[in-house]
A protein has these predicted regions:
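Basic, amphipathic alpha-helix used for nucleic-acid engagement in HTH/winged-helix/SANT-Myb modules
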Residues: 1
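N-terminal low-complexity/disordered regulatory or targeting extensions
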Residues: 6, 12-35, 40-129, 142-231, ...
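C-terminal or late-domain output modules
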Residues: 20, 70-71, 398-406, 438, ...
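Solvent-exposed, amphipathic alpha-helical segments
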Residues: 28-32, 271, 422
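Globular "head" domains of long coiled-coil molecular machines
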Residues: 112-396, 589, 602-632, 636-647, ...
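Charged, amphipathic alpha-helical linkers/stalks
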Residues: 356-360, 364, 385-433
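A non-catalytic, extended alpha-helical scaffold characteristic of dynamin-superfamily P-loop GTPases
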Residues: 429-671, 675, 679
Length: 713
């Protein structure tokens, strides 16, 4: 018999209640809980009170959460990956193609497949005392993560299945530096690159190493330790990777931002908040930005419910009246309602733009669940909903990878056919290419001058968009962040004169600023996208006209080239909107994260930081009283001014447009270089006229055509 569990989990009887029922001291009951040996008179009293028979009472054992089991659907995606890469590797030698053709037609295909066919990641986020590691251990089926996880270190732990361990390593645990060459986040996707792996690694060993670097008891809480990876033979990791993140809100805001930026890598978010203090305002402010950054996987034509990759967990649920279901349902309802009251009216707009679905508070409420190892029934809904998403997501990834490969092949076929036609025409119609080269050289100076003028116009337009963004934001702030405006909002929205209502209002007010700023930036970025589209079309027309006059095929794809260049730059500002709009199905945005709207997440770090500063300095309870609306408004305006909130937004917007301008300059310089190289190579081919080399290229291109036709999709 487990007497303590019998009282708490089965009959829901407190020690105080049993004390009165049996007329015994509470200390005596605690002794029985320790030795599981209550006297028969107590058993009889419990049987009489509950209706349970003696055998049920005496044989009762604490319920145990069943081992989490899910169907291994990643094997289908893994099969696709192995099949395609085996096909590519087996055919590369047979294709007999040079590096230039390989780079032009095959490298992006390989990179896109690599980026698409990555296991989904689950991130566990919450304050340091919410039981993240306990929940992870339960899902893993063994105590791999230390339950005494420290809030004083910014280390993120990636859990992967042992089958995914790179061939060049043997140990279970690896610790990586927090920074290297100016980069602050170790890229877990590059673990199969030995040189990269070794450069970031600072320690390796067994699971004890994780305890040394990541717990209060450990003696190696080194500042330079930023991430760890653990390889475990756990069934759940066959379908997904897990990221265990340090609790936020424990030390510096910068650590919270690091946690947030790491969580953005995830495809599934599990947010934990203690049931006994569920969804406090700090949770709400942090979760709002987490959800904004969460990939939108649900669409009208797939099996996923709305917000399928989000679970908000009321953890340690046994602490609420011994896990009383009615009390917990009310806690979930109230937490969801507080969250809903704290978001701006257009909070869901960016997600709706991707999914074409509308979102309600009820949709969000469906993602709120309970969890505690002490009462298995309170884990069922969490496990059922998690099981759905981790079983279905690998199938979605597999399908998207296949669609990507098909779209890529279809998109490159045209250029491939044009290049093949070029070499065939060079054999039979060389004179036309001699004329073409002469015509290009004759017109190139003027074309370059015209192109330079267009580039300068776009540079000026980017600067103009930057000023417009700042001006519109400043105008919005001057009208919104005022005592009069805030008082009016408080009255119009009928905010109640209590701490919780005012906290929700302040959170919503800040969220509205985030949303409005993102909307302004999105509109300006969309405007730039139209301009870049027109520029690329104009660029293509300017080089195509010389070919068109001679009825020759053009095999220089300016659009594809420009997009490839942008994707390789890294920080691209507003050009990211252009890539999403024009080339979202290509390798540039492979994987689930490509569905995220940039402007919706750009200001998330500010939202997290400002939210913490506002509530730390507001002292809301002291403001409530007879003239509370004006008191709250004055204090809120004062906090915005004190923390220079508007300036922080302007800094982000300025950097966004500066990054845009720098990326555009790099892209057009490289585009022009590649066009010059193309013309130079074409001239060399026409002038030297090496028939053997031309025929070899024809053979290679036909081999690539056959390769595309027979690719196993």
């Amino acid at each position: 018999m487990n007497f303590k569990s019998l009282l708490e989990d089965k009959i829901k009887l407190s020690k105080e209640q049993l004390s009165k029922l049996c007329n015994v001291d509470v200390l005596q009951i605690e002794e029985w809980e320790d030795n599981n040996n209550p006297p028969m008179k107590v058993i009889e009293a419990i049987a009489k009170c509950t209706g349970l028979d003696f055998n049920s009472i005496l044989s009762y054992e604490k319920p145990v959460v069943e081992k989490f089991v899910s169907k291994d659907n990643w094997q289908k995606a893994d099969f696709t990956k192995k099949t395609l890469f085996t096909y590519i590797d087996d055919n590369l030698d047979k294709l007999n193609i040079n590096n230039e053709l390989k780079e032009k037609y095959l490298d992006d295909l390989q990179e896109g497949l690599n980026q698409n066919l990555i296991k989904p990641k689950i991130s566990f986020v919450g304050r340091s005392d919410t039981g993240k590691s306990t929940l992870i251990n339960s899902l893993l089926g063994e105590n791999m993560m230390p339950a005494s996880w420290t809030p004083t270190t910014s280390i993120a732990v990636y859990l992967k299945h042992s089958n995914d361990r790179p061939s060049f390593i043997k140990n279970t645990v690896y610790i990586f530096s927090s920074t290297l060459d100016g980069k602050d986040i170790w890229n877990e996707r590059r673990i199969y690159e030995k040189e990269y792996f070794e450069a970031w690694k600072i320690a390796e060993g067994d699971i004890d190493l994780l305890l040394q670097y990541g717990t209060r008891q450990g003696g190696k809480q080194l500042e330079k330790a930023g991430s760890a990876i653990v390889f475990i033979d756990a069934p759940i990791l066959l379908n997904c990777d897990i990221i265990d993140l340090p609790g936020f809100g424990t030390e510096q805001e910068s650590d919270d931002i690091i946690t947030f930026n790491t969580a953005k890598q995830a495809d599934i978010l599990i947010y934990l908040s203690q049931a006994s203090g569920f969804m406090r305002i700090e949770d709400i402010n942090y979760l709002k930005e987490n959800i904004r950054s969460l990939p939108a996987i649900e669409k009208e034509n797939n099996k996923f419910p709305k917000l399928a990759n989000l679970l908000v967990v009321a953890s340690q649920a046994h602490n609420v009246n011994y896990g009383n279901r009615d009390d917990l349902e009310l806690i979930l309802d109230n937490g969801c309602e507080r969250f809903n009251e704290s978001i701006s009216d257009n909070y869901w707009n960016s997600r709706t733009a991707i999914t074409m679905l509308n979102y309600s508070m009820q949709d969000l409420r469906e993602r709120f669940v309970t969890y505690t190892k002490d009462i298995p029934d309170l884990c069922k809904e969490f496990e059922e909903k998690l099981k759905i998403v981790i079983e279905e997501l690998p199938l979605l990834i597999n399908e998207r990878a296949r669609v990507f490969a098909k779209n890529y092949v279809d998109s490159r076929k045209i250029n491939l056919e044009n290049e093949l036609q070029k070499y065939e025409d060079l054999i039979t119609q060389r004179d036309r290419y001699v004329d073409l080269i002469n015509e290009i050289e004759k017109n190139e100076l003027k074309r370059k001058q015209d192109n330079s003028n267009k580039i300068e116009e776009i540079r000026n337009k980017i600067l103009d968009l930057k000023h417009q963004t700042i001006d519109e934001f400043s105008d919005y702030c001057s009208k919104t962040i005022t005592v009069e405006s805030i008082v009016k909002m408080l009255k119009d929205k009928k905010i109640k004169n209590n701490k919780e209502s005012v906290e929700c209002f302040v959170s919503k007010f800040q969220d509205a600023i985030n949303s409005k700023t993102a909307d302004i930036l999105q509109i300006k970025s969309d405007e730039l996208t139209t301009i870049i589209r027109e520029y690329i079309q104009s660029y293509s027309n300017s080089i195509n006209q010389n070919f068109d006059k001679r009825n020759l095929k053009v095999d220089f794809d300016a659009g594809h080239t420009f997009a490839s260049i942008i994707a390789s730059i890294g920080v691209i500002g507003g050009l990211g909107t252009y890539l999403i709009a024009v080339y979202s199905s290509w390798s540039f945005f492979a994987g689930l994260g490509g569905a995220i709207c940039f402007s919706a997440t750009l200001f998330a770090p500010i939202g997290i930081m400002i939210g913490a500063l506002l509530f730390a300095g507001m002292g809301i309870a002291k403001l409530l009283g007879f003239t509370w609306e004006k008191n709250v408004a004055k204090k809120l305006v004062s906090q915005y001014e004190k923390n220079k909130v508007s300036d922080k937004y302007r800094e982000v917007m300025n950097k966004y447009w500066d990054d845009t301008s720098n990326a555009f300059d790099k892209a057009v310089i490289e585009l022009n270089k590649q066009w010059d190289d193309y013309v130079s190579q074409l001239k060399e081919t026409v002038t030297i006229y090496n028939l053997d080399e031309i025929k070899a290229n024809i053979l290679s291109l036909r081999n690539i055509q056959d390769f595309f036709v027979n690719i196993p999709l």
